[in-house]
Structures are given as C-alpha cells and as structure tokens.
C-alpha cells in the first residue's frame, strides 16, 4: 500500500512538473531576438557655439515643443565637458562623431600649420576633388584629413552600406566631418551663389531634389524679412541693452542696434545668410527636404541625418553671449526645433527615431562686457612681432613664428640652418609669454610631464596635441581673456564657458531623465553606437552614458 501511494505521488509530481515546464516554455521569451532592434532614423544635431547655460538662461521664454521637449521627454547629461583644448568648430564636430580627441582624430583646429607644406592647412581642404553645384572653389573639400572613422561610417559598415547618411550645414566642416568618410551626401552653403553644394568626393552632380531646393532662392526671401526682434525689445530682460560698443556692426551699418536691415543683401551678398537667425531655419528646411527625397527612415535599415546649425556661432561671435541678438536667435531656434521635431513625428513617427543635440564648443563673454568689475580682457596680437624681435636679438635667427590655435610654432629649418639652440629658443619664448597680461602660463607641449599646472588642464592640452600637426609651445590664457583686436568674442579655451556643452538625447531607446555625473563630448558617439548595436568608431576613447539606456 505504501509502495502504491509512493508511485501515485511520484506520478502526480512528475506530471505537475512536466505541465509546469510546458507552461513555462510557452511564456519564456526568446533570449536572442530574431532581428537587431534599431530605430528607423538617427538625427544628430550640433548647435554651433551653444553654451550649456543657454538651456536654462532662456528656459522661461522657450515653448514646450523645442528645448523644453528635449529636457522633459529626453535625457540630459547636464555635466558634459569637452576633454581637450583648443575648443573649436572642426575639433568639436570631429570629436562628437568619432568619440575621440584631436590627438587621435587629427583635427586639431579649423586650420593648422603644416611644416612640410610651409603653409596653413584648412581642416577639410582637398584639392583633388571638385565643386559640385557651383563654379566656385567652395566645394574643394572632403574628410580626408580626418584620421579615424565616425559613428556614421560605422553604421554604414554595420549594414553593409545599406544605411544612408546625409549631412548638412551652412559651414563646410559642419557637414563634412559628421558625415564621415562614407556619407551618401554632405551639403554645405556656397556664399557665392546662395545655394547648397557638395564635392566629387560624394557625387558627380547634385540630386534633383537639391537643385529644386536651391531653385527656391530662399536666402533672398529671408533677406526680405530683415531682422527685428521676435517679441517687443523691452521684454529681452536676459540680455544687456541694445547696441553696445563692444558689438560688431553688420557691413554697411552705422550701429549694431535693431532692426538689422538685410534687404540690401538680396541677390548681392549671400554670405550674410549665415549671420542671421534665419540661417538656422534655412538649414532645417533643407534637412526636412532631404527626408522624403532620400527616403530616410524608409529604407528598411537605420539611416542617419546629421544637421549642424551654424548661425548661432556667427551671431555669438558678432554680438556676444549677453546680447539681445543672441537671445532672439535662441528664441527663434526654439521655434524652429519645435517645427522640426513635429515634422519628424509626422514623417518618421514619434518613438521611431533617435535624436541627440549637443554643441561643438561654447563661448567666452565679450571682453568689453567683462569690464564691469569682472576678470577678463583682450590679448593683443602684437605678441608675435615682439617675439620675433626678441629671438632675433638674442639668437640672431628669424624663427618666422606662427601663432595659431593658442600654439607657437617655430621654423625649425631656420633654427637648424642658423645652428641656434632650439631648446633655449623655446625657453626664451616661454619666459617672454608668461610675463604678458592675460597669459596664465605657457608650456612646452612635448614635455608636459614636467609642467606644473593642474592635471585637468594638462590632460586637455595632451588630448589636443597631435604630433604631426601641433605646435611647440601652448599658451594658456587667464580666465575671461581672448586674443582679438576687434569687437565681439570667440572661443578656444579649456575653461567651462568654452567647454561645458549640452548633451541631450530623445526618442528611441532613451530613458527620460537627467544626470549630473561628469561625461565628455567623446562619450556621445559610443552611446549612439551602443544604442544601435554597432562597433564604436576606430579612434573612440569615450564611454557609454549608461544612465539613459532603457
């Protein structure tokens, strides 16, 4: 009897276990999905010269669909810094899309001095290609000087080049560097014709849709609007009064005050398109036109649209971070972003695209503005001629100094020919520079280990140094100082005003929220790579922002 009961119990237990396993097998999800989950489209947006604090300085005046939507529906890495110096446009776009730094990707400035060629080299110059879409030389450009791959290149390779990559900006470098080496099309603005152009690196002729877009002659239509403030000028309480003496005037204007009259430039001076906030509207209209024309997000593979908005940089340089012009530009940009996001929702579908927005660098306050009891000033550029005289008097050699990107470059051939002591010339140069107003320090770039400066600054200089392209001595300016003789302002320093940038992600795969952990510009490409399940770019040193992953 006991044996019989035991057998019955075991049978019941076995059947129950088997049924449970069957039920479990039915509901157990597959560990490995049948296809790789990816968004239909990735949109990368770079706002040229956007300081991080602009997110919040104008927050109360933004609508709900632009910057506020990014902050409230997306993820914000609030403490994202640039890990190198100099902080310039070409360096920023390269580092965002490569996950790298100038030391590795080779883009150490907008220009740099090439000792072998004996001249300055422009970051995307390429005399081996031709302009497409114009008879000008504005299209003699390509990404050949970029020494590593971009996240856009890696996406193309990951899909055996089925994914499409389209890149657009008013600035050539703002379109070319994000697009990488393998973009299907990179388009930038030609000042001579008022049209978007490209180069034979990408194509032999412009697509029909680009010709149709150019045929609208939108710059002339924007010029007809002139530039008045979007709201009554007295409501611009986040800015200084209009028309400050340290602001630059537009060509032909007697004052820097509103309104700015652009009708005079129609059919004459197309370069002015970049200097008005409508330059951003113009670029985004082109980006919107590219989506249906190139069937972006409809190819069955993840496509990539890279958009860099340049007018914020032109306005910032001319008027400075505290101007009404700058505030008005960002209020207009906020409306443009809302329109663009709504267009993406309609054409690609909300939740079907991944979007990130960041900046290539920030900006220092105008030196004239800082005269109001704050440290800062203008470093006069006569340093170069003074140095030349000093070294000649001491060593009887003309070093033919070049000062670019805060770096001093010597003519080493002239030094060798004169049999002068290179080390002593370098030290004399450093001794002279550290005595100048506005210079915090001057350091031997090739001997950074012996330099007594904070490690954070040292790391940024090292990350910006490329052995084949960089100079001999790096000049570190005092906070708030900028090397210029003209009104307006600039950027290039290690300081937070130049290196603290927004980093916002929204849409597919992104968990809404924010973090104040320290991240870097070079972390953006690895994060996008992780979301797309593709290899990081070949020179990437960044890390994934795991806080935003769903």
Curated annotation (Swiss-Prot):
Catalyzed chemical reaction(s): a phosphate monoester + H2O = an alcohol + phosphate
Gene name for this UniProt entry? phoV
Q: Keyword annotations for this protein?
A: Cell inner membrane, Cell membrane, Hydrolase, Lipoprotein, Membrane, Metal-binding, Phosphoprotein, Signal, Zinc
* Binding note for cofactor: Binds 2 Zn(2+) ions.
Assigned EC number: 3.1.3.1
Q: What is this protein called?
A: Alkaline phosphatase PhoV
Q: What membrane topology does this protein have?
A: Lipid-anchor; Peripheral membrane protein
What is its biological role? Alkaline phosphatase with broad substrate specificity.
A single Gene Ontology CC term: plasma membrane
Which residues are involved in binding Zn(2+) 2?
313, 317, 491
The main place the protein resides is membrane
Q: Which residues form the signal peptide?
A: 1-20
How does activity change as temperature rises? Heat-labile. Activity increases with temperature between 15 and 35 degrees Celsius and decreases with further heating. No activity at 65 degrees Celsius. Preincubation for 10 minutes at 50 or 60 degrees Celsius causes 50% or 100% inactivation, respectively. Heat-inactivated enzyme cannot be renaturated.
| Species of the source | Synechococcus elongatus (strain ATCC 33912 / PCC 7942 / FACHB-805) (Anacystis nidulans R2)
Q: Which superkingdom heads the taxonomic lineage of this protein's source? A: Bacteria
Q: Report the GO molecular function annotations.
A: alkaline phosphatase activity; glucose-6-phosphatase activity; metal ion binding; phosphoglycerate phosphatase activity; sugar-phosphatase activity; zinc ion binding
Enzyme active site: 89 (phosphothreonine intermediate)
Q: Does the keyword Manganese apply?
A: no
